[in-house]
């Protein structure tokens, strides 16, 4: 069944893109933002599309549609695919407390996680049938803090950040845990990089770490590295093709930095600020200086 929702276009809002004075060129990005407000924004700061519901995670699909994990209201949340015209062409409704992640898969399935008394990771078909179900070994006392941005990785396994457990685990499809790493604070993202390392944002720990296959931290950045304090609840992250990392400050107030891009040498080269009351929970950087981010987004 096709469901139509209202979509707003070109909503003006103040933003600032800041580059350090010693950088040779200005950096611009267009991006998808998910959180209390859900929208696409171009590199000039113009909102080109929006969705009238709060979301946790989302992707711009090759066909131009948006795949979104919708925050719960009085239900268990949902996953929707919505066109730029606001037509919902796919919906999978959650059956427990909430749905906290979504990922489109190459085989056409959609990955999602359900939080609740039976925390689980699912692959569902476009017909809404469950093709894969993986039980997640997580605490049950706080459903909201069970998991966040789970991802299927190249070897067919699943990386799952488990917030309150302070651990990132790699599960096989049969539920067996084949790798894990303890984290210094609640992990939000677990991004398996091409070199085999894993990039992890540690939310209220206000830090980002990169660990190798043995769990050793090989790179770390936090508020301790800057005279200003850009970290303010490090939720979503994305590793760009140039090696830089974009990080969200989910709890940032209006007028404060909501997103920032940091180099391997811990230099901030781009920031995004707006006057919205809603924070950015996660995001997808779509281009840099007008050049589309090619390949699989590392987010």
Report the location of each language-model feature.
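N-terminal secretory signal peptides that target proteins for export/translocation
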Residues: 1-2
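Bacterial N-terminal signal peptides
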Residues: 5-17
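Histidine-/acidic-rich catalytic cores in large beta-rich domains
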Residues: 22-299
